[in-house]
C-alpha cells in the first residue's frame, strides 16, 4: 500500500470479497478490465480479464469474454454454469473437470436443438439427465455466489481514479529500506 501511495496510485480496500468489488467496477464500466489470475473473475462477469502478467518478459494475456462466448457459441449463463460445475474457489473438491463438463454440454446442446421447449437451463438438464452433479442444492448455492445483482459496497459510489503526483523523496527513502540504490543527481 505504501509503495502505491508514494507512486500516486489509487487503491481501495473492499469490505468483503475483493473479487466482488472488481467485478462490479468492470460491469459498471468504472474500470475497463481487471488483472487477475483468478479464473472466477470470468464467472463474476468481468468482460475483460488480463492474466499471467510477466514483468520480466513484458507480457500479459488478454481475454475478451464477449468474444470468447461468441466463438464458443454459448450464452454467459451457460458459460457460468460450465465454470461452476468444473470447479471454482468455492467448490474445488468436486469430482468434475472442464473436459467432462464440456462433453456433457455438447450432449445438452444436441438435446436442446431437437427440443421444442428450449427454456431448460444447462444445470437443470444436467441434474435431471446425469449424475454429474451429486448435490444439486449445493451446486445452486455455489452458482448464486457469482450472481452480483445486489452488490453493496459503500465506497463504490465515491470512487475516483485520479492519480496523485509521485512522491519521489518518500518513494526513494522507502525503496532504500529494501536494498534499492539511487544515484544522486
Enumerate the predicted regions with their spans.
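Noncatalytic, basic helical substrate-engagement surface that gates or grips nucleic-acid strands
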Residues: 1-17, 21-25
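Short amphipathic alpha-helical molecular recognition features
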Residues: 10-14, 31, 71, 163
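Short, acidic/turn-prone active-site loops that include or flank metal/cofactor-
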Residues: 17, 39-40, 54-60
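Non-catalytic nucleic-acid-binding/docking modules located in mid-to-C-terminal regions
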Residues: 58-185
Amino acid at each position: 500500500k505504501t509503495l502505491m501511495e508514494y507512486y500516486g496510485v489509487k487503491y481501495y480496500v473492499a469490505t468483503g470479497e475483493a473479487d466482488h468489488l472488481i467485478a462490479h467496477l468492470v460491469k459498471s464500466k468504472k474500470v475497463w478490465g481487471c488483472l487477475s489470475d483468478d479464473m472466477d473473475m470470468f464467472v463474476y462477469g468481468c468482460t475483460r480479464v488480463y492474466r499471467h502478467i510477466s514483468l520480466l518478459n513484458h507480457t500479459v494475456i488478454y481475454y475478451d469474454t464477449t468474444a470468447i462466448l461468441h466463438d464458443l457459441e454459448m450464452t454467459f449463463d451457460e458459460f457460468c454454469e460450465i465454470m461452476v460445475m468444473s470447479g471454482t474457489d468455492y467448490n474445488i473438491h468436486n469430482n468434475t473437470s472442464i473436459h467432462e463438463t464440456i462433453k456433457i454440454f455438447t450432449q445438452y446442446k444436441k438435446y436442446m436443438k431437437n427440443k421444442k421447449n428450449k427454456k431448460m437451463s444447462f444445470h437443470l438438464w444436467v441434474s435431471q439427465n446425469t449424475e454429474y452433479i451429486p448435490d444439486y442444492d449445493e451446486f445452486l448455492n455455489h452458482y448464486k455466489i457469482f450472481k452480483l445483482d445486489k452488490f453493496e459496497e459503500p465506497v463504490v459510489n465515491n470512487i475516483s481514479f485520479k492519480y496523485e503526483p509521485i512522491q519521489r523523496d518518500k518513494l526513494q527513502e522507502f525503496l532504500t529500506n529494501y536494498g534499492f540504490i539511487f544515484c544522486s543527481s
